[in-house]
A protein has these predicted regions:
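Bacterial N-terminal signal peptides that target proteins for export
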Residues: 1-10
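Bacterial N-terminal signal peptides
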Residues: 9-19
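Sec/Tat signal peptide C-region and signal peptidase I cleavage site
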Residues: 19-25
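N-terminal (or domain-start) structured segment
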Residues: 25-115, 151, 161-162, 172-201, ...
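Hinge/capping helix and adjacent helix->loop/strand transition within the periplasmic-binding protein
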Residues: 27-33, 80-89, 103-187, 235, ...
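Short coil/turn segments
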Residues: 40-42, 96-97, 127, 132-137, ...
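C-terminal lobe and pocket-closing loops
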Residues: 124, 206-281, 300-307, 312
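Surface-exposed aromatic
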Residues: 282-301
Length: 317
């Protein structure tokens, strides 16, 4: 069975967003807009949020104040945002997996997917399994062959979802990978570079190393070719029919004022889709490039993500 709905949603909605008009609604905030950031200061998501805040202020005169509310893979921010007023003056940037797989995999996280208004995505990850080039592995098939020959393969994963992915790779190919949990995408990257790990998941920080020839993207986990390694195989080539990348997006509390929702989501999409914007240039270099999915398309994307998360959890039992 193919689980291609999620990646199809991303592509179709991205095309629609790129061709949509960006007329702003007549809404204006009554004070500062708090932009809650689900991750620590200094990382890629934090940088993206701060660039977005700067450009919203510059283009629309809104005072947008970034605030880091990190912890529990995005759950701390989500729990806090849920109880904010739905007037458009409290929004948050997070990884959408935290509101799909994260909700289903965690017992009573303090919120559910329907506790939020989905405004706009900004970009997606370039999730892949990586290895050092000097290992001599060109793709995941080479790693599988090494494991089948008796080699112990240590594999870094920065989330329970990606640990599930390693389990499914092993199950589909008759091998057992030794999973090591790491802190963030750079944890896996650093482990591979230091020879502490044989392979690891990375979601974008590996790109410079791949382009320099020091690292190899062994397999794409996003259901389509990687920007830096368009010839890398897909997980489906090895019997795993799930997508393991994530999108980063801006959300608000449930039942947001309709005029506020329209104005904010359109303003974000305009910045994301503008090739001259600092945000667009940054996410092109650091992530998968601009992907603005808004409104009803974003709602449908999240429904598909939740459906796929349920199937993944069932498959990984």
């Amino acid at each position: 069975m193919k689980f291609g709905t999620l990646k199809t949603m991303v592509m179709a909605a991205g095309i629609a967003a790129a061709s949509a008009t960006t007329a702003m609604a007549e809404w204006e905030p009554n004070g500062p807009i708090k932009l809650m950031i689900a991750f620590d200061a200094g990382g890629g998501v934090d940088t993206s949020a701060r660039l977005l805040a700067e450009e919203l202020t510059a283009r629309h005169g809104w005072e947008v104040i970034p605030e880091n509310v990190a912890g529990r893979g995005g759950a701390t921010m989500a729990a806090a945002l849920k109880d904010e007023p739905a007037d458009g003056q409290s929004i948050g940037l997070t990884a959408m997996d935290s509101l799909a797989y994260g909700v289903l995999a965690t017992q009573n996280p303090g919120f559910g997917a329907d506790d939020f208004t989905y405004l706009s995505t900004i970009t997606g990850t370039q999730a892949a399994l990586i290895a050092k080039s000097d290992r001599g592995w060109n793709n995941l098939g080479d790693v599988i062959a090494a494991a089948q020959a008796g080699e112990t393969i240590t594999a870094g994963a920065m989330s329970a979802k990606l640990a599930d992915a390693l389990y499914l790779i092993g199950e589909a190919n008759g091998i057992e990978l030794t999973t090591v949990m790491v802190q963030g995408g750079k944890g896996g990257l650093n482990g591979v570079v230091a020879d502490d790990l044989d392979i690891a998941w990375a979601a974008g920080p590996q790109t410079n190393g791949v382009l320099a020839g020091d690292l190899v993207n062994l397999v794409s986990a996003i259901g389509r070719p990687l920007n830096a390694s368009p010839d890398a195989p897909l997980l489906s080539d090895y019997g795993v029919e799930f997508v393991f990348g994530t999108m980063f997006g801006v959300i608000g509390p449930a039942d947001m004022d309709p005029e506020a929702r329209e104005a904010i989501q359109n303003a974000i999409a305009e910045i994301v889709n503008d090739p001259e914007s600092q945000l667009s240039n940054y996410i092109t270099k650091a992530f998968g490039g601009p992907e603005a999915i808004t409104g009803a398309d974003f709602d449908a994307f999240m429904q598909a993500a939740n459906n796929e998360a349920a199937l993944l959890l069932e498959a990984a039992q």
